[in-house]
Curated annotation (Swiss-Prot):
Protein name (database record): Cytochrome b6-f complex subunit 5
Keywords: Electron transport, Membrane, Photosynthesis, Thylakoid, Transmembrane, Transmembrane helix, Transport
Complex formation: The 4 large subunits of the cytochrome b6-f complex are cytochrome b6, subunit IV (17 kDa polypeptide, PetD), cytochrome f and the Rieske protein, while the 4 small subunits are PetG, PetL, PetM and PetN. The complex functions as a dimer.
Taxon lineage: Bacteria, Bacillati, Cyanobacteriota, Cyanophyceae, Synechococcales
Family: Belongs to the PetG family.
Stored InterPro entries: Cyt_6/f_cplx_su5, Cyt_6/f_cplx_su5_sf
Species in which this protein is naturally found: Prochlorococcus marinus (strain NATL2A)
Record's keyword annotation contains Lyase: no
One annotated GO biological process: cytochrome complex assembly
Compartments reported by the entry: Cellular thylakoid membrane
Gene Ontology CC entries for this record: cytochrome b6f complex; plasma membrane-derived thylakoid membrane
Disulphides: none
Primary subcellular site in the record, as a coarse category: membrane
Topology relative to the membrane: Single-pass membrane protein
Length: 39
């Protein structure tokens, strides 16, 4: 049996973690392209 609190924490952290990884990857991609317009 899984505790509701633990389940809620996991369901809350997983999307945030995936979003953080996506944002960090997008920042590295945008930085490597070095577009002056985004500065």
């Amino acid at each position: 049996m899984i505790e509701p609190l633990l389940c809620g924490i996991v369901l809350g952290l997983v999307p945030i973690t995936l979003l953080g990884l996506f944002v960090s990857a997008w920042n590295q991609y945008r930085r490597s392209s070095s577009m002056p317009d985004w500065e």
